[in-house]
A protein has these predicted regions:
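Short, low-complexity interaction segments enriched in Ser/Thr/Pro/Gly
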Residues: 1, 24, 110-112
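Bacterial N-terminal signal peptides that target proteins for export
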Residues: 1-9
Length: 158
């Protein structure tokens, strides 16, 4: 069973790599440019999950939440910069008509969607951890900051 799974995964990766090689380098560069901020965000989520697993004090929770917010806001800024840079790009517009580019983006977005769904327990853990602590000035500040960060991220989808 594990061998079949490994062969299947390898086959999918090979097909994706071949699709990338068939794509115009300019289009691939645009896709890579859009992927970069998401890599920052996914790393921030994973780091948050790891930190929450070891948090013992309120100050450690605050530090973990602040670090996540810093990185998540960096993601939003980089994403918006890319969006602005490529707003009127002919390369981006031509990608809608290119099956290889379209497929590469769809595959990446599906993978990203799955990773973000897998991260939901981390966010739930963060929120419940913040709610378990007293209403100190610092906890309230971090709650507000986390809420504002999530709101910024949500605006990307509109």
């Amino acid at each position: 069973m594990n061998l079949k799974f490994a062969v299947s995964v390898w086959s999918v990766l090979l097909v994706l790599r071949l699709a990338v090689f068939a794509m115009d380098p300019e289009k691939q560069a645009v896709i890579d440019r859009y992927k970069a901020p998401f890599a920052v965000y996914l790393t921030a989520i994973n780091d948050l999950g790891s930190a929450l697993g070891t948090v013992k004090t309120e100050s450690e929770l605050i530090k973990a939440a602040d670090k996540f917010c810093d990185e998540a806001n960096k993601f939003v800024d980089e994403f918006n910069a890319n969006k602005e840079q490529f707003a009127d790009s002919q390369v981006v517009k031509s990608m809608d008509d290119d099956p290889d580019s379209k497929k590469a983006m769809e595959d990446y977005m599906e993978s990203l969607k799955s990773k973000l769904e897998d991260a939901r327990p981390i966010f739930e853990n963060l929120i419940s951890s913040l709610n378990r602590h007293s209403d100190s000035r610092e906890i309230n500040r971090v709650r507000d900051r986390v809420a504002a960060t999530f709101q910024r991220i949500q605006l990307l989808y509109m």
